[in-house]
From Swiss-Prot:
Keywords: Aminotransferase, Cytoplasm, Pyridoxal phosphate, Transferase. PROSITE patterns: AA_TRANSFER_CLASS_1. This is Aspartate aminotransferase. L-aspartate binds at residues 38, 124, 174. InterPro entries: Aminotransferase_I/II_large (IPR004839), AspAT/PAT-like (IPR050596), NHTrfase_class1_PyrdxlP-BS (IPR004838), PyrdxlP-dep_Trfase (IPR015424), PyrdxlP-dep_Trfase_major (IPR015421), PyrdxlP-dep_Trfase_small (IPR015422). It comes from Bacillus subtilis (strain 168). GO terms for biological process: amino acid metabolic process; biosynthetic process. The keyword Ribosomal protein does not apply. It comes from the Bacteria. The keyword Cytoplasm applies.
Length: 393
């Protein structure tokens, strides 16, 4: 059967391809270290699990409103006020089946054919594909490594056309882990206000920040910027709840209403049980979150120092999330590979270390390593990479 053009044009996920190959090697009995994970390696905190079990025993196993439980939307609104001093009414919030689906639904309701969305590179792999699925056109603006992968107001201005509808800002970033400062966000925001561009602020890694740095949302900088922004967030990364599939969007009532209408004809509601777990996540203790954040920071500081000692590797130190995004072009060349993608494939075949080539994130000279695994495995992986480079150089 001939498939729809919009699906046939999709680019397969580089991350999933590497993960599948790693699983294949593991199944064959090889000692594979996988650093492709996009999820915390900690279990969901117990009080959240208990709340979900309790909700089932209390009979909360039926449909909920398409936009999410009122109690959960109230908890999210309280979280915004408590953490970022932003005020949203429940009618300005929609709960979705994960932050990814919140983004998908948003693009579906704001984009018409050929509308343009500015996406800074490097980017999370699903941004351009979701834009294309909604009929839009991704427009890439390069975040240079010497600028810590962040774009400037001038770059943004130069990318704007009469078809520009939105820009995606992801801070802390997947895959780089860098964060925009308040001053940088304010400058980008002024350009967006001047040209009436919607700001899509992906804040899913908000709680995972390091070096004493605190996340800043562009929506908290002014009332005008709040009105011009849709925030995407969820409990997946902050509370180690990736499998629960609870995310949300917060923005103007007209956009949220349209997203809710679309959800009513697509997913209906997010899983009722997971929603009760998310309520417990936002109303429960913060100690498990801080313990996870501290563990990630310790891993980062330990392996970053070892990684940059590998010949041919350079790396901007992350400020958040749980990824390293080093430039490996020089290492690949010194090892005799035509590009970084070939380097990554050979590394997996020979040393059984799975990392993700940066080509899938719009940066073909880089690779992404997740430190969402044990420190022992991380240190062993770095040793294997170093051995691989020294052997081929």
């Amino acid at each position: 059967m001939k498939l729809a053009k919009r699906v046939s044009a999709l680019t397969p996920s580089t991350t999933l391809a590497i993960t599948a190959k790693a699983k294949e090697l593991k199944a064959a009995g090889h000692d594979v270290i996988g650093l492709g994970a996009g999820e915390p390696d900690f279990n969901t905190p117990q009080h959240i699990i208990d709340a979900a079990v309790r909700s089932m025993n209390e009979g909360h196993t039926k449909y909920t409103p398409s936009g999410g439980l009122a109690e959960l939307k109230n908890s999210i609104a309280e979280k915004f006020k408590r953490d970022q001093n932003i005020e949203y009414k429940p009618s300005q919030i929609i709960v979705c089946t994960g932050a990814k689906h919140a983004l998908y639904t948003l693009f579906q309701v704001i984009l018409d054919e050929e509308d343009e969305v500015i996406i800074p590179t490097p980017y999370w792999v699903s941004y351009p594909e979701q834009v294309k699925l909604a009929g839009g056109k991704p427009v890439y603006v390069e975040g240079l490594e010497e600028n810590h992968f962040k774009i400037s107001p001038e770059q943004l201005k130069n990318a704007i056309t009469e078809k520009t509808k939105a820009i995606v800002i992801n801070s802390p970033s997947n895959p780089t882990g860098v964060m925009y400062t308040e001053e940088e966000l304010s400058a980008l925001g002024e350009v967006c206000l001047e040209h009436d561009i919607l700001i899509v602020s992906d804040e899913i890694y908000e709680k995972l920040t390091y070096g004493g740095k605190k996340h800043v949302s562009i929506a908290q900088l002014s009332d005008r910027l709040k009105e011009q922004t849709v925030i995407i967030n969820g409990v997946s990364k902050s509370h180690s709840m990736t499998g629960w599939r609870i995310g949300y969007a917060a923005g103007s009532e007209d956009i949220i209403k349209a997203m809710t209408n679309l959800a009513s004809h697509s997913t209906s509601n997010p899983t009722s049980i997971a929603q009760y777990g998310a309520i417990a996540a936002y109303n429960g203790p913060s100690e498990p979150l801080e313990e996870m954040r501290e563990a990630f920071e310790h891993r980062l500081n330990t392996i970053y120092a070892k990684l940059i000692e590998i010949p041919g590797f350079s790396c901007v130190k992350p400020e958040g999330a749980f990824y390293l995004f080093p430039n490996a072009k020089e290492a690949a060349q010194s090892c005799g590979f035509k590009d970084v993608d070939e380097f990554v494939k050979a590394l997996l075949e020979e040393e059984k270390v799975a990392i993700v080539p940066g080509s899938g994130f719009g940066s073909p000279e880089n690779v992404r390593l997740s430190y969402a695994t044990s420190l022992d495995l991380l240190e062993e992986a770095i040793e294997r990479i170093k051995r691989f480079v020294e052997k081929h150089s």
